[in-house]
Protein backbone atom coordinates (compact mmCIF):
# COMPACT_ATOMS: atom_id res chain seq x y z
CA UNK A 1 0.00 0.00 0.00
CA UNK A 2 2.72 2.43 1.02
CA UNK A 3 4.74 1.47 -2.06
CA UNK A 4 1.79 2.35 -4.28
CA UNK A 5 1.42 5.77 -2.66
CA UNK A 6 5.18 6.37 -3.01
CA UNK A 7 5.10 5.48 -6.72
CA UNK A 8 2.08 7.75 -7.21
CA UNK A 9 3.80 10.71 -5.55
CA UNK A 10 7.00 10.09 -7.56
CA UNK A 11 5.01 10.06 -10.80
CA UNK A 12 3.20 13.26 -9.82
CA UNK A 13 6.46 15.05 -9.02
CA UNK A 14 8.01 13.90 -12.33
CA UNK A 15 4.98 15.16 -14.25
CA UNK A 16 5.16 18.51 -12.46
CA UNK A 17 8.89 18.78 -13.23
CA UNK A 18 8.23 18.18 -16.94
CA UNK A 19 5.38 20.70 -16.92
CA UNK A 20 7.49 23.44 -15.33
CA UNK A 21 10.90 22.69 -16.86
CA UNK A 22 10.74 25.68 -19.25
CA UNK A 23 9.14 28.05 -16.71
CA UNK A 24 11.43 30.80 -15.31
CA UNK A 25 12.33 30.31 -11.66
CA UNK A 26 10.91 33.67 -10.54
CA UNK A 27 7.48 32.78 -11.94
CA UNK A 28 7.48 29.50 -10.00
CA UNK A 29 8.41 31.34 -6.81
CA UNK A 30 5.74 34.01 -7.28
CA UNK A 31 3.12 31.44 -8.20
CA UNK A 32 3.90 29.34 -5.14
CA UNK A 33 3.72 32.41 -2.90
CA UNK A 34 0.37 33.39 -4.42
CA UNK A 35 -1.10 29.92 -3.87
CA UNK A 36 0.17 29.92 -0.30
CA UNK A 37 -1.40 33.36 0.29
CA UNK A 38 -4.76 32.29 -1.13
CA UNK A 39 -4.74 29.11 0.94
CA UNK A 40 -4.01 31.03 4.11
CA UNK A 41 -6.64 33.66 3.35
CA UNK A 42 -9.32 31.01 3.65
CA UNK A 43 -7.76 28.60 6.14
CA UNK A 44 -5.50 30.69 8.39
CA UNK A 45 -7.71 32.65 10.85
CA UNK A 46 -5.12 35.36 11.45
CA UNK A 47 -4.59 36.17 7.77
CA UNK A 48 -8.31 35.85 7.09
CA UNK A 49 -9.02 38.48 9.76
CA UNK A 50 -6.37 40.78 8.33
CA UNK A 51 -7.83 40.47 4.83
CA UNK A 52 -11.36 41.15 6.11
CA UNK A 53 -10.18 44.25 7.95
CA UNK A 54 -8.68 45.51 4.68
CA UNK A 55 -11.84 45.07 2.62
CA UNK A 56 -12.71 48.78 2.70
CA UNK A 57 -9.48 49.76 0.88
CA UNK A 58 -9.58 49.85 -2.92
CA UNK A 59 -6.95 48.00 -4.95
CA UNK A 60 -5.52 51.36 -6.03
CA UNK A 61 -5.20 52.44 -2.40
CA UNK A 62 -3.50 49.18 -1.44
CA UNK A 63 -0.94 49.59 -4.24
CA UNK A 64 -0.26 53.20 -3.19
CA UNK A 65 0.14 52.18 0.46
CA UNK A 66 2.47 49.30 -0.42
CA UNK A 67 4.62 51.46 -2.69
CA UNK A 68 4.92 54.13 0.00
CA UNK A 69 5.85 51.55 2.64
CA UNK A 70 8.76 50.45 0.44
CA UNK A 71 9.86 53.92 -0.68
CA UNK A 72 9.62 55.93 2.54
CA UNK A 73 12.84 54.47 3.94
CA UNK A 74 14.91 55.48 0.91
CA UNK A 75 17.29 58.43 1.49
CA UNK A 76 15.70 61.83 0.84
CA UNK A 77 12.22 60.51 0.00
CA UNK A 78 10.54 61.92 3.10
CA UNK A 79 12.07 65.34 2.51
CA UNK A 80 10.79 65.42 -1.07
CA UNK A 81 7.29 64.36 0.00
CA UNK A 82 7.18 66.94 2.78
CA UNK A 83 8.22 69.70 0.38
CA UNK A 84 5.47 68.80 -2.08
CA UNK A 85 2.80 68.45 0.59
CA UNK A 86 3.65 71.86 2.01
CA UNK A 87 3.08 73.29 -1.48
CA UNK A 88 -0.27 71.54 -1.79
CA UNK A 89 -1.51 72.79 1.60
CA UNK A 90 -0.12 76.31 1.40
CA UNK A 91 -3.45 77.64 0.13
CA UNK A 92 -5.24 76.12 3.12
CA UNK A 93 -2.84 77.76 5.56
CA UNK A 94 -3.14 81.06 3.72
CA UNK A 95 -6.93 80.85 3.98
CA UNK A 96 -6.65 80.38 7.75
CA UNK A 97 -4.28 83.33 7.95
CA UNK A 98 -6.65 85.61 6.03
CA UNK A 99 -9.65 84.51 8.10
CA UNK A 100 -7.86 85.46 11.32
CA UNK A 101 -5.93 88.49 10.14
CA UNK A 102 -8.44 90.97 11.57
CA UNK A 103 -8.91 89.17 14.87
CA UNK A 104 -7.29 90.02 18.18
CA UNK A 105 -5.98 86.69 19.43
CA UNK A 106 -4.60 86.31 22.94
CA UNK A 107 -1.88 83.95 24.07
CA UNK A 108 -3.12 83.74 27.67
CA UNK A 109 -6.17 84.22 29.88
CA UNK A 110 -6.51 87.94 30.73
CA UNK A 111 -4.91 88.97 34.04
CA UNK A 112 -8.03 90.98 34.95
CA UNK A 113 -11.57 90.05 34.02
CA UNK A 114 -13.09 91.76 30.97
CA UNK A 115 -16.46 93.46 30.73
CA UNK A 116 -19.34 91.63 29.03
CA UNK A 117 -19.24 94.07 26.09
CA UNK A 118 -15.52 93.46 25.56
CA UNK A 119 -16.07 89.72 25.69
CA UNK A 120 -18.97 89.84 23.22
CA UNK A 121 -16.88 91.88 20.80
CA UNK A 122 -14.56 88.88 20.44
CA UNK A 123 -17.44 86.87 18.95
CA UNK A 124 -17.76 89.22 15.97
CA UNK A 125 -21.48 89.57 16.70
CA UNK A 126 -23.42 92.82 16.68
CA UNK A 127 -25.26 92.38 19.96
CA UNK A 128 -27.71 95.18 19.13
CA UNK A 129 -28.88 93.75 15.82
CA UNK A 130 -27.83 90.52 14.13
CA UNK A 131 -30.40 89.20 11.69
CA UNK A 132 -30.00 86.23 9.40
CA UNK A 133 -29.25 87.54 5.90
CA UNK A 134 -31.43 85.55 3.49
CA UNK A 135 -31.36 85.57 -0.29
CA UNK A 136 -34.94 86.81 -0.06
CA UNK A 137 -37.57 86.21 2.59
CA UNK A 138 -41.19 86.10 1.47
CA UNK A 139 -42.82 85.69 4.86
CA UNK A 140 -42.83 87.57 8.14
CA UNK A 141 -42.30 84.57 10.38
CA UNK A 142 -40.67 85.12 13.78
CA UNK A 143 -37.66 83.11 12.59
CA UNK A 144 -36.35 86.32 11.00
CA UNK A 145 -35.31 87.41 14.49
CA UNK A 146 -32.09 85.42 14.55
CA UNK A 147 -29.48 86.30 17.13
CA UNK A 148 -26.70 83.73 16.82
CA UNK A 149 -24.97 83.91 13.43
CA UNK A 150 -25.06 85.14 9.86
CA UNK A 151 -25.53 83.48 6.49
CA UNK A 152 -27.35 83.76 3.20
CA UNK A 153 -29.24 80.48 2.88
CA UNK A 154 -26.63 78.89 0.60
CA UNK A 155 -24.99 76.57 3.13
CA UNK A 156 -25.59 72.83 2.93
CA UNK A 157 -26.54 71.33 6.28
CA UNK A 158 -24.61 73.87 8.34
CA UNK A 159 -27.55 75.52 10.08
CA UNK A 160 -30.62 73.40 10.79
CA UNK A 161 -32.90 75.89 12.49
CA UNK A 162 -33.64 79.58 12.91
CA UNK A 163 -34.75 80.06 16.48
CA UNK A 164 -37.38 82.71 17.11
CA UNK A 165 -36.08 85.50 19.33
CA UNK A 166 -38.42 84.31 22.06
CA UNK A 167 -36.76 80.88 22.14
CA UNK A 168 -33.27 82.36 22.03
CA UNK A 169 -34.06 84.48 25.08
CA UNK A 170 -35.57 81.43 26.81
CA UNK A 171 -32.43 79.36 26.18
CA UNK A 172 -30.28 82.14 27.60
CA UNK A 173 -32.34 82.05 30.79
CA UNK A 174 -32.26 78.25 30.94
CA UNK A 175 -28.49 78.14 30.50
CA UNK A 176 -27.93 80.73 33.19
CA UNK A 177 -30.01 78.74 35.64
CA UNK A 178 -28.48 75.31 34.95
CA UNK A 179 -24.91 75.78 33.67
CA UNK A 180 -23.29 74.69 36.95
CA UNK A 181 -25.53 71.69 37.61
CA UNK A 182 -24.30 68.12 37.07
CA UNK A 183 -26.66 65.21 36.24
CA UNK A 184 -24.12 62.77 37.68
CA UNK A 185 -25.01 63.91 41.20
CA UNK A 186 -28.37 63.58 42.93
CA UNK A 187 -28.12 67.14 44.23
CA UNK A 188 -30.24 68.32 41.27
CA UNK A 189 -33.19 65.89 41.10
CA UNK A 190 -35.13 68.03 38.61
CA UNK A 191 -32.25 67.89 36.11
CA UNK A 192 -32.08 64.11 36.50
CA UNK A 193 -35.84 63.89 36.03
CA UNK A 194 -35.65 66.09 32.92
CA UNK A 195 -33.02 63.78 31.47
CA UNK A 196 -35.31 60.80 32.08
CA UNK A 197 -38.18 62.69 30.43
CA UNK A 198 -36.12 63.53 27.33
CA UNK A 199 -35.05 59.90 26.92
CA UNK A 200 -38.67 58.75 27.34
CA UNK A 201 -39.87 61.31 24.78
CA UNK A 202 -37.28 60.06 22.28
CA UNK A 203 -38.05 56.40 22.98
CA UNK A 204 -41.72 57.11 22.28
CA UNK A 205 -40.86 59.05 19.14
CA UNK A 206 -38.94 56.05 17.76
CA UNK A 207 -41.59 53.60 18.99
CA UNK A 208 -39.50 52.15 21.80
CA UNK A 209 -40.91 50.72 25.01
CA UNK A 210 -40.96 52.07 28.55
CA UNK A 211 -38.28 49.53 29.44
CA UNK A 212 -35.89 50.91 26.82
CA UNK A 213 -32.63 52.61 27.79
CA UNK A 214 -31.02 55.76 26.44
CA UNK A 215 -28.27 58.37 26.69
CA UNK A 216 -28.10 62.06 25.96
CA UNK A 217 -24.72 62.57 24.24
CA UNK A 218 -22.60 65.36 22.77
CA UNK A 219 -23.33 64.49 19.13
CA UNK A 220 -23.83 61.77 16.55
CA UNK A 221 -20.27 60.51 16.65
CA UNK A 222 -20.48 60.10 20.42
CA UNK A 223 -23.82 58.29 20.14
CA UNK A 224 -22.34 55.89 17.60
CA UNK A 225 -19.23 55.25 19.71
CA UNK A 226 -21.37 54.58 22.79
CA UNK A 227 -23.46 51.98 20.96
CA UNK A 228 -20.52 50.29 19.23
CA UNK A 229 -18.49 50.17 22.44
CA UNK A 230 -21.36 48.47 24.25
CA UNK A 231 -21.58 45.74 21.61
CA UNK A 232 -17.81 45.25 21.34
CA UNK A 233 -17.47 44.93 25.13
CA UNK A 234 -20.28 42.35 25.09
CA UNK A 235 -18.59 40.42 22.28
CA UNK A 236 -15.31 40.25 24.19
CA UNK A 237 -17.16 39.08 27.29
CA UNK A 238 -18.51 36.22 25.17
CA UNK A 239 -14.95 35.19 24.27
CA UNK A 240 -14.72 36.83 20.84
CA UNK A 241 -11.11 38.02 20.58
CA UNK A 242 -11.56 39.96 17.34
CA UNK A 243 -15.02 41.59 17.35
CA UNK A 244 -16.24 42.87 13.99
CA UNK A 245 -18.53 45.82 13.24
CA UNK A 246 -20.30 45.16 9.92
CA UNK A 247 -21.45 48.32 8.12
CA UNK A 248 -22.49 49.38 4.61
CA UNK A 249 -19.69 51.21 2.79
CA UNK A 250 -21.90 54.33 2.92
CA UNK A 251 -22.04 54.31 6.74
CA UNK A 252 -20.73 57.38 8.54
CA UNK A 253 -16.99 57.65 9.25
CA UNK A 254 -17.83 57.65 12.97
CA UNK A 255 -18.11 53.86 12.77
CA UNK A 256 -14.49 53.68 11.65
CA UNK A 257 -13.56 55.89 14.58
CA UNK A 258 -15.53 53.64 16.93
CA UNK A 259 -13.75 50.55 15.58
CA UNK A 260 -10.33 52.10 16.08
CA UNK A 261 -11.13 53.29 19.60
CA UNK A 262 -12.52 49.93 20.71
CA UNK A 263 -9.95 47.76 18.93
CA UNK A 264 -12.67 46.19 16.77
CA UNK A 265 -12.33 45.35 13.09
CA UNK A 266 -14.53 47.34 10.71
CA UNK A 267 -16.05 45.24 7.93
CA UNK A 268 -17.53 47.30 5.09
CA UNK A 269 -20.17 45.84 2.80
CA UNK A 270 -20.50 47.13 -0.80
CA UNK A 271 -23.81 48.82 -1.61
CA UNK A 272 -25.87 48.43 -4.75
CA UNK A 273 -24.35 50.79 -7.32
CA UNK A 274 -27.75 51.69 -8.74
CA UNK A 275 -29.78 52.24 -5.58
CA UNK A 276 -27.01 53.26 -3.16
CA UNK A 277 -28.49 50.98 -0.46
CA UNK A 278 -26.99 47.81 0.98
CA UNK A 279 -28.40 44.46 -0.12
CA UNK A 280 -29.32 42.27 2.90
CA UNK A 281 -28.26 39.13 1.01
CA UNK A 282 -24.83 40.62 0.41
CA UNK A 283 -24.52 41.77 4.02
CA UNK A 284 -25.43 38.28 5.18
CA UNK A 285 -22.28 36.89 3.58
CA UNK A 286 -20.14 39.26 5.70
CA UNK A 287 -21.59 38.19 9.04
CA UNK A 288 -19.54 35.62 10.96
CA UNK A 289 -19.27 34.27 14.49
CA UNK A 290 -17.04 37.31 15.21
CA UNK A 291 -19.73 39.87 14.32
CA UNK A 292 -20.40 42.10 17.32
CA UNK A 293 -23.04 44.26 15.61
CA UNK A 294 -24.43 45.06 12.16
CA UNK A 295 -25.44 48.55 11.04
CA UNK A 296 -27.90 50.21 8.67
CA UNK A 297 -28.30 53.92 7.81
CA UNK A 298 -31.64 55.75 7.91
CA UNK A 299 -30.62 57.67 5.88
CA UNK A 300 -26.93 57.85 4.91
CA UNK A 301 -24.99 61.10 5.08
CA UNK A 302 -23.63 60.83 1.54
CA UNK A 303 -26.69 60.68 -0.66
CA UNK A 304 -29.60 60.65 1.78
CA UNK A 305 -30.55 57.07 0.87
CA UNK A 306 -31.82 54.73 3.57
CA UNK A 307 -30.92 51.07 3.78
CA UNK A 308 -33.73 48.45 3.84
CA UNK A 309 -34.10 48.48 7.62
CA UNK A 310 -36.97 45.98 7.79
CA UNK A 311 -35.09 43.37 5.75
CA UNK A 312 -31.89 44.01 7.70
CA UNK A 313 -33.88 43.50 10.90
CA UNK A 314 -34.99 40.10 9.64
CA UNK A 315 -31.36 39.26 8.89
CA UNK A 316 -30.29 40.34 12.38
CA UNK A 317 -32.95 38.12 13.96
CA UNK A 318 -31.95 35.18 11.78
CA UNK A 319 -28.25 35.56 12.56
CA UNK A 320 -28.87 36.47 16.22
CA UNK A 321 -26.76 39.62 15.83
CA UNK A 322 -27.44 43.07 17.40
CA UNK A 323 -28.64 45.63 14.84
CA UNK A 324 -27.92 49.36 15.15
CA UNK A 325 -29.81 51.92 13.04
CA UNK A 326 -27.86 55.12 12.44
CA UNK A 327 -30.46 57.89 12.18
CA UNK A 328 -28.08 60.65 13.29
CA UNK A 329 -28.74 62.76 10.22
CA UNK A 330 -32.45 62.33 9.59
CA UNK A 331 -33.90 60.73 12.70
CA UNK A 332 -35.73 63.82 13.91
CA UNK A 333 -37.02 64.43 10.39
CA UNK A 334 -38.31 60.95 9.54
CA UNK A 335 -39.80 60.54 13.04
CA UNK A 336 -42.30 63.32 12.25
CA UNK A 337 -43.25 61.93 8.83
CA UNK A 338 -45.41 58.95 7.96
CA UNK A 339 -43.05 55.98 7.68
CA UNK A 340 -45.60 53.33 8.60
CA UNK A 341 -45.21 51.59 5.23
CA UNK A 342 -41.44 51.36 5.68
CA UNK A 343 -40.55 51.74 9.37
CA UNK A 344 -36.94 52.47 10.32
CA UNK A 345 -37.06 52.40 14.11
CA UNK A 346 -37.94 50.08 17.00
CA UNK A 347 -41.08 48.97 15.16
CA UNK A 348 -38.73 46.75 13.14
CA UNK A 349 -38.06 43.44 14.95
CA UNK A 350 -34.32 43.00 15.34
CA UNK A 351 -33.42 46.67 15.84
CA UNK A 352 -31.59 46.90 19.16
CA UNK A 353 -30.32 50.50 19.14
CA UNK A 354 -30.71 53.84 17.34
CA UNK A 355 -28.56 56.96 17.17
CA UNK A 356 -30.28 60.27 16.31
CA UNK A 357 -29.06 63.87 16.51
CA UNK A 358 -31.20 66.38 18.36
CA UNK A 359 -29.05 69.26 17.10
CA UNK A 360 -30.06 68.65 13.49
CA UNK A 361 -33.77 68.41 12.72
CA UNK A 362 -34.57 68.43 16.43
CA UNK A 363 -33.53 72.12 16.27
CA UNK A 364 -31.70 71.82 19.62
CA UNK A 365 -28.44 73.59 20.51
CA UNK A 366 -25.31 72.08 18.98
CA UNK A 367 -23.72 69.20 20.81
CA UNK A 368 -26.86 67.17 21.54
CA UNK A 369 -27.80 63.69 20.36
CA UNK A 370 -29.38 60.52 21.72
CA UNK A 371 -28.30 56.89 21.75
CA UNK A 372 -31.32 54.67 22.39
CA UNK A 373 -31.44 50.95 23.21
CA UNK A 374 -34.44 48.64 22.94
CA UNK A 375 -35.72 46.76 25.97
CA UNK A 376 -34.33 43.49 24.59
CA UNK A 377 -30.95 44.88 23.53
CA UNK A 378 -28.22 42.42 24.57
CA UNK A 379 -25.91 45.29 25.54
CA UNK A 380 -26.27 48.70 27.16
CA UNK A 381 -23.87 51.62 27.27
CA UNK A 382 -23.11 51.73 31.00
CA UNK A 383 -19.81 51.91 32.87
CA UNK A 384 -19.12 50.84 36.45
CA UNK A 385 -15.93 50.60 38.52
CA UNK A 386 -17.10 49.29 41.87
CA UNK A 387 -13.71 48.44 43.40
CA UNK A 388 -12.12 51.86 42.84
CA UNK A 389 -10.36 53.23 45.93
CA UNK A 390 -12.27 56.49 45.51
CA UNK A 391 -15.59 54.75 46.04
CA UNK A 392 -18.29 53.45 43.74
CA UNK A 393 -18.01 54.95 40.25
CA UNK A 394 -20.79 54.43 37.73
CA UNK A 395 -21.88 56.47 34.71
CA UNK A 396 -24.86 56.24 32.34
CA UNK A 397 -22.60 55.82 29.32
CA UNK A 398 -19.09 54.62 28.63
CA UNK A 399 -17.46 57.94 27.70
CA UNK A 400 -18.87 60.76 29.80
CA UNK A 401 -18.44 61.45 33.48
CA UNK A 402 -19.51 64.89 34.66
CA UNK A 403 -21.51 67.00 32.21
CA UNK A 404 -23.43 70.23 32.51
CA UNK A 405 -27.11 70.00 33.30
CA UNK A 406 -27.57 72.91 30.89
CA UNK A 407 -27.40 70.49 27.98
CA UNK A 408 -30.31 68.49 29.41
CA UNK A 409 -32.29 71.62 30.25
CA UNK A 410 -31.82 73.24 26.84
CA UNK A 411 -32.91 70.09 25.01
CA UNK A 412 -35.94 69.87 27.31
CA UNK A 413 -36.78 73.53 26.67
CA UNK A 414 -36.34 73.31 22.88
CA UNK A 415 -38.43 70.17 22.42
CA UNK A 416 -41.12 71.63 24.67
CA UNK A 417 -41.15 74.95 22.81
CA UNK A 418 -41.52 73.49 19.32
CA UNK A 419 -43.89 70.62 20.03
CA UNK A 420 -44.82 67.79 17.68
CA UNK A 421 -47.03 69.87 15.40
CA UNK A 422 -44.27 72.38 14.63
CA UNK A 423 -41.76 69.60 13.98
CA UNK A 424 -44.21 67.96 11.59
CA UNK A 425 -44.72 71.27 9.82
CA UNK A 426 -40.95 71.75 9.42
CA UNK A 427 -40.42 68.16 8.20
CA UNK A 428 -43.16 68.43 5.57
CA UNK A 429 -41.84 71.78 4.32
CA UNK A 430 -38.37 70.26 3.82
CA UNK A 431 -39.81 67.35 1.82
CA UNK A 432 -41.83 69.78 -0.32
CA UNK A 433 -38.68 71.77 -1.06
CA UNK A 434 -36.73 68.64 -2.00
CA UNK A 435 -39.53 67.61 -4.37
CA UNK A 436 -39.55 71.09 -5.91
CA UNK A 437 -35.79 70.98 -6.57
CA UNK A 438 -36.05 67.56 -8.19
CA UNK A 439 -38.97 68.76 -10.32
CA UNK A 440 -37.01 71.81 -11.49
CA UNK A 441 -33.96 69.65 -12.27
CA UNK A 442 -36.08 67.24 -14.32
CA UNK A 443 -37.51 70.17 -16.28
CA UNK A 444 -34.01 71.57 -16.81
CA UNK A 445 -32.59 68.46 -18.47
CA UNK A 446 -35.76 67.88 -20.52
CA UNK A 447 -35.99 71.36 -22.00
CA UNK A 448 -33.30 70.71 -24.61
CA UNK A 449 -31.17 73.67 -23.59
CA UNK A 450 -27.84 71.91 -23.99
CA UNK A 451 -27.96 69.86 -20.79
CA UNK A 452 -29.02 66.25 -20.35
CA UNK A 453 -29.40 63.85 -17.44
CA UNK A 454 -25.89 62.64 -18.24
CA UNK A 455 -24.50 66.09 -17.42
CA UNK A 456 -26.13 66.37 -13.99
CA UNK A 457 -28.44 64.05 -12.09
CA UNK A 458 -29.55 63.05 -8.60
CA UNK A 459 -28.12 59.71 -7.53
CA UNK A 460 -30.50 56.94 -6.47
CA UNK A 461 -33.95 57.64 -5.10
CA UNK A 462 -33.51 59.87 -2.02
CA UNK A 463 -36.74 60.37 -0.07
CA UNK A 464 -35.65 62.70 2.70
CA UNK A 465 -33.59 65.88 2.94
CA UNK A 466 -30.39 65.19 0.99
CA UNK A 467 -29.84 65.31 -2.76
CA UNK A 468 -26.60 63.73 -4.01
CA UNK A 469 -25.49 65.05 -7.41
CA UNK A 470 -23.29 63.31 -9.97
CA UNK A 471 -22.29 63.75 -13.59
CA UNK A 472 -21.27 61.28 -16.28
CA UNK A 473 -19.78 63.95 -18.55
CA UNK A 474 -18.07 66.37 -16.14
CA UNK A 475 -15.97 66.29 -13.01
CA UNK A 476 -18.64 66.74 -10.32
CA UNK A 477 -16.11 68.46 -8.06
CA UNK A 478 -15.55 71.10 -10.74
CA UNK A 479 -19.31 71.74 -10.75
CA UNK A 480 -19.31 72.16 -6.96
CA UNK A 481 -16.34 74.51 -7.31
CA UNK A 482 -18.29 76.67 -9.76
CA UNK A 483 -21.25 76.70 -7.38
CA UNK A 484 -18.92 77.82 -4.59
CA UNK A 485 -17.95 80.80 -6.76
CA UNK A 486 -21.65 81.66 -6.76
CA UNK A 487 -21.80 81.57 -2.96
CA UNK A 488 -22.89 77.97 -2.37
CA UNK A 489 -21.13 75.88 0.28
CA UNK A 490 -21.81 72.23 -0.54
CA UNK A 491 -20.40 68.92 0.71
CA UNK A 492 -17.98 67.20 -1.66
CA UNK A 493 -18.26 63.40 -1.95
CA UNK A 494 -15.76 60.88 -3.25
CA UNK A 495 -15.56 57.26 -4.43
CA UNK A 496 -17.22 58.19 -6.76
CA UNK A 497 -16.95 61.97 -7.07
CA UNK A 498 -20.06 63.99 -6.36
CA UNK A 499 -21.54 66.60 -4.05
CA UNK A 500 -24.67 66.89 -1.99
CA UNK A 501 -27.12 69.51 -0.83
CA UNK A 502 -28.56 68.93 2.64
CA UNK A 503 -31.82 70.84 3.06
CA UNK A 504 -32.81 72.27 6.43
CA UNK A 505 -35.53 74.46 7.91
CA UNK A 506 -33.43 77.47 6.91
CA UNK A 507 -33.82 76.76 3.20
CA UNK A 508 -37.60 76.49 3.45
CA UNK A 509 -37.71 80.14 4.59
CA UNK A 510 -35.90 81.38 1.49
CA UNK A 511 -38.23 82.57 -1.24
CA UNK A 512 -37.84 80.73 -4.59
CA UNK A 513 -34.90 78.77 -3.20
CA UNK A 514 -35.29 75.93 -5.71
CA UNK A 515 -35.33 78.34 -8.66
CA UNK A 516 -32.16 80.08 -7.51
CA UNK A 517 -30.33 76.80 -6.88
CA UNK A 518 -31.26 75.25 -10.24
CA UNK A 519 -30.32 78.49 -12.05
CA UNK A 520 -26.87 78.49 -10.47
CA UNK A 521 -26.50 74.73 -11.00
CA UNK A 522 -27.27 75.09 -14.71
CA UNK A 523 -24.72 77.88 -15.11
CA UNK A 524 -22.11 75.89 -13.19
CA UNK A 525 -22.52 72.78 -15.36
CA UNK A 526 -22.36 74.81 -18.57
CA UNK A 527 -19.20 76.56 -17.39
CA UNK A 528 -17.54 73.24 -16.57
CA UNK A 529 -18.52 71.77 -19.94
CA UNK A 530 -16.79 74.74 -21.56
CA UNK A 531 -13.55 74.25 -19.62
CA UNK A 532 -10.49 73.98 -21.88
CA UNK A 533 -8.96 70.50 -22.15
CA UNK A 534 -6.49 69.73 -19.38
CA UNK A 535 -8.04 72.17 -16.92
CA UNK A 536 -6.11 71.88 -13.65
CA UNK A 537 -8.02 71.61 -10.37
CA UNK A 538 -7.72 74.22 -7.66
CA UNK A 539 -9.01 74.81 -4.13
CA UNK A 540 -10.99 71.95 -2.60
CA UNK A 541 -11.04 70.07 -5.92
CA UNK A 542 -7.25 70.01 -5.93
CA UNK A 543 -7.12 68.84 -2.32
CA UNK A 544 -9.57 65.98 -2.94
CA UNK A 545 -7.64 64.91 -6.04
CA UNK A 546 -4.31 64.98 -4.23
CA UNK A 547 -5.61 63.07 -1.21
CA UNK A 548 -6.98 60.35 -3.47
CA UNK A 549 -3.46 59.61 -4.69
CA UNK A 550 -1.83 59.61 -1.23
CA UNK A 551 -1.03 56.72 1.09
CA UNK A 552 -3.43 56.44 4.02
CA UNK A 553 -0.56 57.19 6.40
CA UNK A 554 0.00 60.59 4.76
CA UNK A 555 -3.73 61.33 4.56
CA UNK A 556 -4.02 60.92 8.33
CA UNK A 557 -0.90 62.99 8.96
CA UNK A 558 -2.15 65.86 6.82
CA UNK A 559 -5.51 65.87 8.61
CA UNK A 560 -3.69 65.86 11.94
CA UNK A 561 -1.50 68.81 10.96
CA UNK A 562 -4.47 70.73 9.58
CA UNK A 563 -6.42 70.30 12.82
CA UNK A 564 -3.36 71.43 14.78
CA UNK A 565 -3.17 74.53 12.58
CA UNK A 566 -6.81 75.36 13.31
CA UNK A 567 -6.14 75.29 17.05
CA UNK A 568 -2.81 77.13 16.84
CA UNK A 569 -3.31 80.52 15.21
CA UNK A 570 0.44 80.99 14.72
CA UNK A 571 0.72 77.73 12.76
CA UNK A 572 -1.97 78.99 10.39
CA UNK A 573 0.18 81.83 9.16
CA UNK A 574 3.73 80.58 8.89
CA UNK A 575 6.04 77.60 9.16
CA UNK A 576 6.01 74.19 7.50
CA UNK A 577 3.87 71.26 8.48
CA UNK A 578 6.79 69.30 9.85
CA UNK A 579 5.10 66.08 8.81
CA UNK A 580 8.12 63.90 9.41
CA UNK A 581 9.44 65.74 12.46
CA UNK A 582 10.09 63.49 15.47
CA UNK A 583 7.17 63.34 17.88
CA UNK A 584 7.08 62.32 21.51
CA UNK A 585 3.90 60.41 20.70
CA UNK A 586 4.37 58.10 17.75
CA UNK A 587 0.73 57.16 17.37
CA UNK A 588 -2.75 58.21 18.41
CA UNK A 589 -4.21 56.66 21.54
CA UNK A 590 -7.10 55.33 19.45
CA UNK A 591 -4.75 53.61 17.02
CA UNK A 592 -2.77 52.17 19.92
CA UNK A 593 -5.95 50.76 21.44
CA UNK A 594 -6.91 49.15 18.17
CA UNK A 595 -3.46 47.62 17.79
CA UNK A 596 -3.96 45.87 21.11
CA UNK A 597 -6.92 44.11 19.52
CA UNK A 598 -4.99 43.22 16.37
CA UNK A 599 -1.60 42.46 17.87
CA UNK A 600 -1.82 38.75 17.23
CA UNK A 601 -2.85 39.35 13.63
CA UNK A 602 0.10 41.61 12.91
CA UNK A 603 2.50 39.27 14.72
CA UNK A 604 1.40 36.29 12.68
CA UNK A 605 2.15 38.17 9.48
Swiss-Prot record:
The keyword Lyase applies. Keywords: Lyase, Pyridoxal phosphate. Its EC number is 4.1.2.27. GO terms for cellular component: membrane. One of its GO terms (biological process) is sphingolipid catabolic process. It is an enzyme of class 4 (lyase). It holds the Pfam family Pyridoxal_deC. It comes from the Bacteria. InterPro entries: GrpII_AminoAcid_Decarb, PyrdxlP-dep_de-COase, PyrdxlP-dep_Trfase, PyrdxlP-dep_Trfase_major, PyrdxlP-dep_Trfase_small. Its cofactor is pyridoxal 5'-phosphate. One of its GO terms (molecular function) is pyridoxal phosphate binding. The modification N6-(pyridoxal phosphate)lysine is found at residue 360. It catalyses: sphinganine 1-phosphate = hexadecanal + phosphoethanolamine. The keyword Cell division does not apply. Cleaves phosphorylated sphingoid bases (PSBs), such as sphingosine-1-phosphate, into fatty aldehydes and phosphoethanolamine. Possibly implicated in influencing the macrophage autophagy pathway. Belongs to the group II decarboxylase family. Sphingosine-1-phosphate lyase subfamily. This is Probable sphingosine-1-phosphate lyase. It comes from Legionella pneumophila (strain Paris).
Amino acid sequence: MFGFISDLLTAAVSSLDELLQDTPAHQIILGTAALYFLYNQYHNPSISRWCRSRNNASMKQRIIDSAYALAKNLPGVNQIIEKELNKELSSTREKLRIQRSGMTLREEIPEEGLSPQDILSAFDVDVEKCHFDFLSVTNDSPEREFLVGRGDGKDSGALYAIHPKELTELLKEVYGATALTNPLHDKWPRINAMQAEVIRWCQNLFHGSKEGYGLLTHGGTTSIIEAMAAYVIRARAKGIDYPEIVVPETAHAAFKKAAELTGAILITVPVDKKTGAVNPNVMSSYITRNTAVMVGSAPSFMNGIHDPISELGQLAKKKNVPFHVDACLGGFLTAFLDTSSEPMDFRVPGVTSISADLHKYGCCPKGTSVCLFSEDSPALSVYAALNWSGGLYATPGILDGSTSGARVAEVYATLSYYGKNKYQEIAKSIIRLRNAIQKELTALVEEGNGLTSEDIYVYGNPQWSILGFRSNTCNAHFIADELEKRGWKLNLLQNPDGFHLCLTHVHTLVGSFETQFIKDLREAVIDVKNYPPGKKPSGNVKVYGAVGMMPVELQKEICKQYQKARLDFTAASHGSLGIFAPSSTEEDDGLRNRKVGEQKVQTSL
